[in-house]
From Swiss-Prot:
It comes from Salmonella dublin (strain CT_02021853). Disulfide bonds: none annotated. The keyword Membrane does not apply. L-aspartate binds at residues 131, 135-136. The keyword Amino-acid biosynthesis applies. L-citrulline binds at residues 99, 135, 139, 192, 201, 203, 280. This is Argininosuccinate synthase. Pathway: Amino-acid biosynthesis; L-arginine biosynthesis; L-arginine from L-ornithine and carbamoyl phosphate: step 2/3. Belongs to the argininosuccinate synthase family. Type 2 subfamily. It is found in: Cytoplasm. The lineage of its organism: Bacteria, Pseudomonadati, Pseudomonadota, Gammaproteobacteria, Enterobacterales. The gene is argG. ATP binds at residues 17-25, 43, 129, 131, 136, 194. One of its GO terms (molecular function) is ATP binding.
């Protein structure tokens, strides 16, 4: 069976991930006119820039959908977001600022839940708005086929007939008007935005040029913290975790994770927390640039890692970071539910996250400027008295440390012999200044 259909399968049911925007509206109407039977599926991901979710399926029916469904994905999305925080599943960082993989998390949820809904309706052909140059076309492909082994893919944006007729937004708008729908194009922004309740992605157009900065972006989850005219008073916030799960903000306990994430977004968003500018490697190995918002994810991540460093030992923390980066890349690649990802998730959640219980108090200021004010946990292995510089009882004595240092003589002697061995092999040069062979100064090389 052919998995990817290059031309419209007339007479057959086609499920389309319908956002209600110009692209998917024109595509749905065009497919109906060309003889297909379109079914529209809209994911409610708690997008901060969407005001009326219930209106989206109604518009789909007006444009010719045989049926239209709104699928509430928020609970599952937040569950996956919390799992990512527990595992540190983030691999893209620049200057200490993290991209929280909010788009890959959204695709993992959308790609599985929408295709599952289609399968319930007997719809085994799926189309979405992802382009052939991006990451999402592969993410949706993988998640769709994982959910429904019989799935076929039809994307109007890969169909030359569709492209020839409606290849641009102007043509799509004219097509909608000609068909009796007063569809006006929204005002073109200097960049494209995609969002869910975990975060927002701003990319493309002017942001493809590296001399266009974050200052051209209008945040949809936060504030312009770089604009000194925007007043942002400092604010204290306390985050509580129980066994790796965020349960309370500022003393308020949440039984609903969705409400908890919305409140975390509001708190972090008031300061522009979690906004970053990243150059990343797409799945196809080409570099792209995005500006990201994730105020709630950032707030929870900061508090979680503060507890992590106070509770776990050095090797466990190192494994958390190493495995987390691996898992973050798998998530980015659309492999969040692959066996290698599940193996990493299980270990990190079972042995690391389960011990993260306690409270962290922060002072948030502008952007990613914050201070940690207090850290409290019954599980802390940080004990101030162990290494106090003040006189008093200690768990070990000066003689104990002398013995420990004496044992180091073994590997120090081995290292010294190795250095002179490298010098004999010509890999290092002798140094009269230190008495040890050294790497030759590159400034002197060739003189």
């Amino acid at each position: 069976m052919t998995t990817i259909l290059k031309h419209l399968p007339a007479g057959q049911r086609i499920g389309i991930a319908f956002s209600g925007g110009l692209d998917t509206s024109a595509a749905l109407l065009w497919m109906r006119q060309k003889g297909a039977v379109p079914y529209a599926y809209t994911a409610n991901l708690g997008q901060p820039d969407e005001d009326d979710y219930d209106a989206i399926p109604r518009r789909a029916m007006e444009y010719g959908a045989e049926n239209a469904r709104l699928i509430d994905c928020r609970k599952q999305l937040v569950a996956e977001g919390i799992a990512a925080i527990q595992c540190g599943a983030f691999h893209n960082t620049t200057g200490g600022l993290t991209y929280f993989n909010t788009t890959p998390l959204g695709r993992a949820v959308t790609g599985t839940m929408l295709v599952a809904a289609m399968k319930e309706d007997g719809v085994n052909i799926w189309g979405d708005g992802s382009t052939y140059k991006g990451n999402d076309i592969e993410r949706f492909y993988r998640y769709g086929l994982l959910t429904n082994a019989e799935l076929q893919i039809y994307k109007p944006w890969l169909d030359t007939d569709f492209i020839d007729e409606l290849g641009g937004r102007h043509e799509m708008s004219e097509f909608m008007i000609a068909c009796g729908f007063d569809y006006k194009m929204s005002v073109e922004k200097a960049y494209s935005t995609d969002s869910n309740m975990l975060g927002a992605t701003h990319e493309a157009k002017d942001l493809e040029f590296l001399n266009s900065s974050v200052k051209i972006v209008n945040p949809i989850m936060g504030v312009k913290f770089w604009d000194e005219s925007v007043k942002i008073p400092a604010e204290e916030v306390t985050v509580r975790f129980e066994q790796g799960h965020p349960v309370a903000l500022n003393g308020k306990t949440f039984s609903d994770d969705v409400e908890m994430m919305l409140e975390a977004n509001r708190i972090g968003g008031r300061h522009g927390l979690g906004m970053s500018d990243q150059i990343e490697n797409r799945i196809i190995e080409a570099k792209s640039r995005g500006i990201y918002e994730a105020p709630g994810m950032a707030l929870l991540h900061i508090a979680y890692e503060r507890l992590l460093t106070g509770i776990h030992n050095e090797d466990t923390i190192e494994q958390y970071h190493s495995h987390g980066r691996q898992l973050g890349k798998l998530l980015y690649l659309g492999r969040w539910f692959d066996s290698q990802a599940l193996m990493l998730r299980d270990g990190l959640q079972r042995w690391v996250a389960s011990q993260i219980t306690g409270e962290v108090t922060l002072e948030l200021r502008r952007g990613n400027d914050y201070s940690i004010l207090n850290t409290v946990s019954d599980n802390l292995t940080y004990k101030a008295e162990r290494l106090t510089m003040e006189k008093g009882e200690s768990v070990f004595s000066p003689d104990d440390r002398i013995g420990q240092l004496t044992m180091r003589n073994l590997d120090i002697t081995d290292t010294r012999e190795k250095l002179f061995g490298y010098a004999k092999a010509g890999l290092l040069t002798a140094s009269s200044a230190t008495g040890l062979p050294q790497v030759e100064n590159l400034e002197n090389k060739g003189k």
